[in-house]
Amino acid sequence: MTYLPSPRDVPIHKLFLVVILTALALTASSLGHTQARKDREFRECPDCPVMVGIPAGTFLMGSPKNEQGRFDSEGPQRVVSIKAFALGKYDITTAQFIDFLKSTGHRPMPCNRILGFAWGSPGRGLELQLPNWPAVCLEWIDAEAYVAWLNAKVHKERPALAPGPGPYRLPSEAEWEYAARAGTKTARWWGEAIGRNRANCNGCGSPWDDRLFATVESFAPNPFGLYGMLGNAWQWTEDCWHPNYIHAPDDGRAWTEKNCAKHVIRGGSWNSLPVLVRSASRSISTSDGGDYDNSSLTGFRVARDLP
């Protein structure tokens, strides 16, 4: 892992040169994958998320018509090009999100008013979750607020960064699937079948099956070195919801419209059936809360632009 004890002294283009070069080397050789993954990791400040450099490439997005459990929203399949970027090694954790709440005073909306699930709820707030669980009970706007705070934090520690938005953001839906597949073409990065103890879902054969969240390091990482891309907690993407991929961009950017109220979530959660725990599976959640919605099972991880 690349740690930066003095961020102000490291030019940003040099910081990511090693990330990009080692990512390219990873695609050219099957030797030393574990070390190559570690070489692509970086963290821009002591309490910033650990990021993993993802190599540029093309992939077939969506599911084939014969994939077991396929939904029409996962097609038509198409070739998508992805620029090199970085993605969080883990979901943002409860501890990381609490740091954000304490720093900003941000108050997420309740995600289940019937059961009283909310951040800051006396006696039963989400702050009581384990610190290394994925932070959940979050709407898309909460994830965006965290990203804005993280960008302000990094800009403060790195004044040489170009002015303007970024570099952190939510991943596009295409980036998310590309990273989840990690070069594989099967329904899940480990194969077609759900197997046993590969992820946390309702039928994944793990100790947490349909019971509760697992910690973010509970299962093996995928070939890109990313943990928990499938199962445990849904993850927000930048994209607005569309019922299929007709007219979708093929350059990896997010497919958005101004003020859309519905956004795409990916990956499945601890109570999802295996059919939803596939690389191509996608679902929908609103940005305006409600008595009960998917946000009670939804968190996020951050992406980062690379020069």
Region locations from a protein language model:
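Residues embedded in well-ordered beta-strands
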Residues: 52, 79, 187, 235, ...
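Short, structured beta-strand segments at or near domain termini in extracellular proteins/domains
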Residues: 294-307
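A short glycine-rich, aromatic-capped structural motif
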Residues: 43-116, 136-142, 231
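N-terminal pre-domain segments of enzymes
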Residues: 37-43
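N-terminal secretory signal peptides that target proteins for export/translocation
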Residues: 1-13
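Boundary at the C-terminal end of the N-terminal hydrophobic targeting segment
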Residues: 32-36
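Bacterial N-terminal signal peptides
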Residues: 18-27
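Functional-site microenvironments in short loops/helix caps that host divalent-cation chemistry
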Residues: 60, 64-69, 117-286, 291
